[in-house]
């Protein structure tokens, strides 16, 4: 099992964790309906890239 030789200081620990944060998901606006959805996913109304691909639950 690997064991560290020297304790990592709080500064170095923070530098190591500098890129461990979560980023906001990329959102897109459907041009035909104006709805916001995740990129490369269908909108809540079932539209993807301007075409109706699935029926919505209320339809």
From Swiss-Prot:
Disulfide cysteine pairs (residue numbers): none
HAMAP family in the cross-refs: Ribosomal_bL32
Single GO term (MF): structural constituent of ribosome
Superkingdom of the organism of origin: Bacteria
Name this protein carries in UniProt: Large ribosomal subunit protein bL32
Keyword match Ribonucleoprotein: yes
Region (Disordered): 1-28
Organism of this sequence: Aromatoleum aromaticum (strain DSM 19018 / LMG 30748 / EbN1)
Pfam families xrefs: Ribosomal_L32p
One GO location term (cellular component): large ribosomal subunit
Keywords: Ribonucleoprotein, Ribosomal protein
Gene Ontology biological process: translation
Family note: Belongs to the bacterial ribosomal protein bL32 family.
Claim: Ribonucleoprotein is one of the keywords in the record: yes
InterPro entries tied to this protein: Ribosomal_bL32, Ribosomal_bL32_bact, Ribosomal_zn-bd
């Amino acid at each position: 099992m690997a064991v560290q030789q020297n304790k990592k200081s709080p500064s170095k620990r923070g530098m190591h964790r500098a890129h461990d944060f979560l980023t906001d998901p990329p959102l897109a606006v459907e041009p035909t309906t104006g709805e916001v959805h995740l990129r490369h996913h269908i909108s809540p109304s079932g539209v993807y890239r301007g075409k109706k691909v699935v029926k919505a639950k209320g339809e």
